[in-house]
Amino acid sequence: EMTSSLVGSEMCIRDRYLINQGIQQLTKDHSLVEEMVRLGGIKPEEAKHHPDKNIITRAIGAKADVEVDFYEHRLKRGDIILMCTDGLSNMVEDEELFHIVQGGRDIVESGQALIEAAKENGGTDNIGVVLIEPFADEVSVL
């Protein structure tokens, strides 16, 4: 069992994905564009490149009280958690993220391959990647 939380768009880690048989985004940003998607104003594929994608609707310190979203996830053997900045998620489509992580490399090589894919796709923003394999037999750190 894993609990994650979110306020805003997480300056350090923007997106959290669960990867196993497919890719699933675990959290939703508190952003104007995410709200537009939720209300049907734009399609999810339009959100990634929308000019207002960085306008957040919730942030720590913006008000005395802030609402935090908590998410519960049941994990199983083979799951891999990907946390990343938008320097990765804006440059590499979900399908490519999935294929890189499930491509038979070890977790460190997968992380390096994700960064390279973002650079090859024209990434100029900072690219942060954390991959966690909760049921791994050994720990690898880069």
Language model segments and positions:
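Short, well-structured alpha-helical segments that form the helix of a local strand-helix-strand
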Residues: 107-120
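Conserved, helical-rich catalytic subdomain that frames metal- and/or nucleotide-binding sites
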Residues: 28-77, 141
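Single conserved hydrophobic/aromatic residue that forms the stacking wall/gate
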Residues: 1-8, 13-15
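Short acidic-glycine loop/turn motifs at beta-strand connectors
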Residues: 18-22, 134-135
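P/S/T/G-enriched low-complexity
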Residues: 135-142
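Conserved beta-strand-loop-short alpha-helix elements that form
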Residues: 10-14, 55-64, 70-100, 119-121, ...
